[in-house]
């Protein structure tokens, strides 16, 4: 499997594994974090060849970007940095998103909001350009913030050299088509895992049509596919994973049974279960980029081992069939 992959029609190339930094933003969603440890984790990733680092203003209400900015300052030219626009907590809009970190967060993809979001991100990240700039969440009513205005602003920022590529997150096929009718969309970021492959049917065809890359988040289903979870694992009542249908007891039992069947492969390839899952995920769609979160250097060290794997086609096919059968059983 090809280790390096191009992003859309750009000249940007990166190993298929990137590092997600939502967790290092801390807060009520992820709990308290050690910023010094987070910085060491990012530095470890850079030293081990991870190129793409993804963040967003709303992760920890600016905290993730601040930590990432400190960590990459001496290595900015060696990495690709993506962040996002479109979620506001400083002012109210007619489009409420959700409460995050005790604040009301709203969607806003107007020209003024995008430019303000970018300048705030540049300051927190201590850089003068962003490699990939995503619209984080789309507004359901484009009469409120016309997509023409949004895309025109992004294209202008690209001309100004403040961003290098345009991305969109949490989209539909119709929205991708609309973006692409207005200019070049380079990449989308969507939830995707071996358990949740809905974008393969719904979004992949339109992405291939317009040469748009896909970056997957939550490939390990919030830790469920790491091998560290058992049927006896108990989540606290406030744990967000209670809302993940795959964590439900019945589904979890079937999932853990399949993971157990992968043990011979982890032994054959001398790798962790996470390595296998990330590899299988990256191999499941053409040119897929996989975003893996990490809070400790040892997690980075393990994730990077995936890039040295080279699974035999027969093994890849057998494991893919196991997950296809699993998906059919837990629908």
Task: Name the predicted role of every residue range.
Residues 138-331:
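Beta/alpha (TIM)-barrel catalytic core signal, keyed to glycine-rich beta->alpha loops juxtaposed to Asp/Glu
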Residues 23-35, 100-115, 142-143:
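Active-site mouth loops of central-metabolism enzymes
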Residues 1-80:
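N-terminal binding-site loop/beta-alpha segment at the start of enzyme catalytic domains
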Residues 16, 52, 129-132, 165, ...:
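Residues at the N-termini of beta-strands
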Residues 122-141:
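Active-site groove signature of glycoside hydrolases
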Residues 32-45, 110-124, 171-178:
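Short, acidic/polar
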Residues 10-29, 84-104, 134:
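N-terminal small/glycine-rich loop or linker at the start of catalytic domains
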């Amino acid at each position: 499997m090809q280790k390096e992959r191009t992003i859309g029609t750009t000249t940007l190339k990166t190993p298929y594994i990137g590092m997600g930094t939502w967790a290092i933003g801390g807060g009520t969603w992820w709990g308290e974090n050690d910023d010094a440890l987070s910085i060491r984790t990012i530095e470890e990733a850079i030293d081990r060849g991870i190129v793409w680092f993804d963040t967003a203003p709303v992760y920890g209400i600016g905290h993730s970007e601040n930590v990432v900015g400190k960590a990459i300052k001496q290595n900015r030219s060696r990495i690709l940095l993506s962040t996002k626009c479109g979620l506001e907590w400083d002012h109210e809009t007619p489009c409420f998103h959700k409460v995050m970190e005790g604040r009301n967060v709203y969607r806003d993809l107007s020209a003024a909001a995008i430019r303000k979001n970018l300048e705030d991100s540049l300051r927190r990240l201590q850089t003068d350009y962003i490699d990939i700039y995503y619209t984080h969440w789309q507004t359901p009513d484009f009469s409120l913030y016309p997509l023409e205005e949004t895309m025109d602003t992004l294209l202008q920022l690209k001309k100004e050299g403040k961003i290098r590529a345009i991305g969109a997150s949490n989209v539909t096929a119709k929205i991708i088509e609309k973006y692409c009718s207005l200019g070049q969309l380079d990449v989308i970021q969507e939830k995707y895992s071996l358990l949740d492959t809905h974008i393969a049917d719904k979004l992949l065809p339109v992405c291939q049509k317009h040469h748009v890359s896909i970056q997957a988040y939550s490939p390990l289903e919030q830790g469920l596919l790491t091998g560290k979870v058992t049927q006896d694992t108990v989540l606290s009542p406030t744990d967000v994973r209670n809302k993940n249908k795959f964590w439900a007891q019945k589904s979890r039992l079937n999932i853990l049974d399949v993971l157990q069947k992968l043990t011979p492969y982890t032994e054959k390839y001398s790798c962790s279960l996470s390595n296998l899952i990330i590899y299988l995920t990256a191999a499941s769609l053409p040119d897929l980029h996989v975003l893996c979160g990490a809070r400790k250097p040892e997690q980075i060290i393990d994730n990077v081992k995936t890039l040295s794997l080279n699974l035999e086609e027969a093994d890849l096919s057998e494991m893919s069939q196991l997950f296809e059968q699993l998906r059919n059983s837990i629908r």
